[in-house]
From Swiss-Prot:
Entry's transmembrane regions: 37-57, 121-141, 152-172, 186-206, 229-249, 298-318, 332-352, 354-374
Protein name: Heme A synthase
Organism: Cereibacter sphaeroides (strain ATCC 17025 / ATH 2.4.3)
Gene name linked to the record: ctaA
EC number: 1.17.99.9
Classification of source organism: Bacteria, Pseudomonadati, Pseudomonadota, Alphaproteobacteria, Rhodobacterales
Keyword set, alphabetical order: Cell membrane, Heme biosynthesis, Iron, Membrane, Metal-binding, Oxidoreductase, Plasmid, Transmembrane, Transmembrane helix
Length: 391
């Protein structure tokens, strides 16, 4: 009986080949879903950013209270004839803003503010429609990457909540003798818009690379830079809230000087609340401070200084990374912060002229996204190559 010769290296040379690692579910993408979902998210990102800008213009033109009803579906159709315009104008005439601020307004003037508010709401409907069509389309076609439907569903849920908060905010300006919405409700509304925009941006960044690429990149995660961007996100979010409080009571127009505030560092009466005794233990006093122009404007300036100072310090650390893309992200962020300082000062000195004020708000959106971009690259660095010249 012949004896079969065996190689002493048989286990290594002739054994079963190890399976080749496969990409994750999002890599397979079920027919390119990853790319499609990313494009869909980018469309939503542009729409939400436009929504924030239009919302700012609606506020700056005092148009937000021109529509006194909340009709999510039927409100999509504007007045189409003279009778409908007259009926709509009559509803506005019952509002405190008309009686106390716009008495005698002409139909043409009313139509001008009406179209701003209608456009703002209509854009919200478009965002909801784009989200619903995209989400249901990917879901029904079974092209939704495994594990992604909850986070994409969350965008729609938050969008619906945002619509309700928008009406809750508007309703506050239709009561009593108010001629504007409550600044605290405006702050909630704007803050949620930034949260939604940030969620969309983060998911789109994740979809820019495969799961395998993200897994490899995560091995070189730069924890210190990631922690620094976390601090920046917290401070930037606080600054957004404070900016909304300033805008809600037009606090920027009362102190058109810089770096001082009408000749002093601490504005006069910044701790004064009408009708409430100054008492650190009194919640009414604390809430009243949010309606004090000097107090909220001072905090907004200080938070801005803190954000820029931290951003520039963290930029120094970001420049030390070996990853070129990460260095570039911190460079862009530092430049945006400096530009935002200039816009902020310009907004103050112009007493919040709408052109400068809206540019300042757009700057806040840009900074928010750039922080998220730097954070993403700190968590998932893009590995450079000497051969490709990307190191």
């Amino acid at each position: 009986m012949a004896v079969k010769k065996r190689s002493i290296f048989e286990e290594v040379g002739q054994g079963a080949k190890a399976p080749v690692p496969q990409g994750g579910s999002i890599d397979r993408g079920q027919g390119g879903a990853r790319r499609g979902i990313r494009l869909w998210l980018m469309a939503l990102f542009v729409l939400v950013m436009a929504m924030i800008v239009v919302g700012g213009l609606t506020r700056l033109t005092d148009s937000g209270l021109s529509i006194t009803e909340w009709r999510p579906v039927t409100g999509a159709v504007p007045p189409l004839n003279e009778a409908e315009w007259t009926a709509e104008f009559e509803k506005y005439r019952q509002s405190p803003q008309y009686r106390l601020m716009n008495a005698g307004m002409s139909m043409a003037e009313f139509q001008r503010i009406y179209w701003w508010e209608w456009g703002h709401r209509q854009l919200g409907r478009v965002i909801g429609l784009v989200w619903a069509v995209g989400f249901l389309g990917f879901l029904v076609a079974r092209k939704m990457p495994r594990g992604w439907w909850p986070r994409l569903l969350a965008l729609g849920v938050l969008g619906g909540i945002q619509g309700g908060i928008g009406w809750w905010m508007v309703a506050s300006g239709l009561e009593g003798d108010r001629v504007a919405v409550e600044s605290t409700r405006l702050a909630v509304h704007l803050s949620l818009a930034f949260i939604i925009l940030g969620m969309i941006a983060w998911q789109a960044l994740l979809l820019g690379r495969t799961e395998a690429e993200l897994f490899q990149a995560r091995r070189q995660r730069e924890g210190r830079l990631y922690g620094m961007t976390t601090v920046l996100i917290v401070v930037a979010f606080l600054q957004v809230v404070l900016g909304a409080l300033v805008a809600g009571i037009d606090a920027g127009r009362g102190f058109p000087t810089w770096p001082d505030m009408n000749g002093t560092f601490l504005p006069a009466d910044m701790l004064y609340v009408p009708g409430v005794e100054t008492d650190w233990r009194n919640p009414a006093w604390w809430l009243g401070l949010l309606q004090n122009p000097g107090f909220v404007q001072f905090l907004h300036r200080m938070a801005g200084y803190a954000l820029v100072a931290l951003g520039l310090v963290f930029w120094i650390f970001g420049r030390r990374t070996k990853h070129r893309a990460t260095r570039g992200a911190f460079d862009l962020l530092a430049l945006a912060l400096l530009a935002q300082v200039a816009l902020g000062v310009g907004t103050v000195l112009s007493a919040a002229e709408w052109q400068v004020a809206i540019a300042h708000q757009v700057g806040a959106v840009v900074i928010w996204v750039l922080i998220l971009h730097a954070r993403h690259l700190a968590h998932y660095p893009r590995v450079g190559s000497i051969r490709k010249g990307t190191l």
